Amino acid sequence: MARRYDELPHYPGIVDGPAALASFPETVPAVPGPYGPHRPPQPLPPGLDSDGLKREKDEIYGHPLFPLLALVFEKCELATCSPRDGAGAGLGTPPGGDVCSSDSFNEDIAAFAKQVRSERPLFSSNPELDNLMIQAIQVLRFHLLELEKVHDLCDNFCHRYITCLKGKMPIDLVIEDRDGGCREDFEDYPASCPSLPDQNNMWIRDHEDSGSVHLGTPGPSSGGLASQSGDNSSDQGDGLDTSVASPSSGGEDEDLDQERRRNKKRGIFPKVATNIMRAWLFQHLSHPYPSEEQKKQLAQDTGLTILQVNNWFINARRRIVQPMIDQSNRTGQGAAFSPEGQPIGGYTETQPHVAVRPPGSVGMSLNLEGEWHYL
């Protein structure tokens, strides 16, 4: 660390000593600078030749405090160009450590003082040189403190930036959880209603003529989708039950508020909201794309935002409507479902009744009056 000046690399073309200074003429014109004109190089003091310069350099390099000065200078370079990894910095710390902290410098001074005192005194016989070395170490120490402030500001900025990013990320997590909840809500539809894709066009046409869909518990003669999905409803909000059509009492309102808060934390929509949007979806299967006004009305009815309603219908078209189309294309029985709402085949206008009953499932039939019956 405390290399001699003669051992340091010298570059070709650079002449050291008084000869280099003597090569400049004394009549060099003064060049204006930001702080006034520059003075031409002054001749060396009498008696200061190359031997005198070498002797003074040897005194500086041989001073007891020079190793500490070189160490602080090296720490300044490392603190400027190397990232910090949080490791403690002391004597022998590899490059890239936390070299610009106050604790590191204090440890270096303590270790250096302990090492030097056991060998030789800290000062030389030249008080002027001692003062120069101390001032140089202090200047580098101030430089380290300023670098430490810069690192602290950088750490503070990074911490605040990461905190801001973490505050934004739960939105994506909520959307992902909501997609998972919608997947659980809609998984039972293709399995519980395998014959529904073959007959949904007639159901849509009849209910569009009537202008509404009954969300309450239907009677024996009109047991339909609401009845079946109501029987198969789960805790996640499956089915169209009577809670949509009937008013709630004070206790039920309290339960709904608690359920809404709980579902909000879990990223799942309330049961009432999903029932309303699911009813609209099955009522408009011919064109399951609500307009902006319809989205606004659904948002008011469900208590959700327009963006949440829009995302729910995007997921519903992917997880409900598309599986119904795929199921209809795979089975090939009855009237295949088409997104335009027109039956591809399977019945004619003269047919009074259409019924499909796959093996191992509950059969359902739909007559031309728009009434569902269990087989």
UniProtKB/Swiss-Prot annotation:
Residues 227-241 have a biased composition (Low complexity). One of its GO terms (cellular component) is chromatin. One of its GO terms (molecular function) is DNA-binding transcription factor activity, RNA polymerase II-specific. It is found in: Nucleus. Residues 262-324 bind DNA. GO terms for biological process: angiogenesis; animal organ morphogenesis; brain development; embryonic pattern specification; eye development; hemopoiesis; positive regulation of cell population proliferation; positive regulation of transcription by RNA polymerase II. Residues 96-179 form the MEIS N-terminal domain. Residues 31-46 have a biased composition (Pro residues). Keywords: DNA-binding, Homeobox, Nucleus. The keyword Metal-binding does not apply. Residues 25-51, 197-268, 329-348 are annotated as: Disordered. Pfam families: Homeobox_KN (PF05920), Meis_PKNOX_N (PF16493). It comes from the Eukaryota. The keyword DNA-binding applies. InterPro entries: HD (IPR001356), Homeodomain-like_sf (IPR009057), KN_HD (IPR008422), PKNOX/Meis_N (IPR032453), TALE_homeobox (IPR050224). Belongs to the TALE/MEIS homeobox family. Transcriptional regulator which directly modulates PDPK1 expression, thus promoting survival of pancreatic beta-cells. Also regulates expression of NDFIP1, BNIP3, and CCNG1. This is Homeobox protein Meis3.
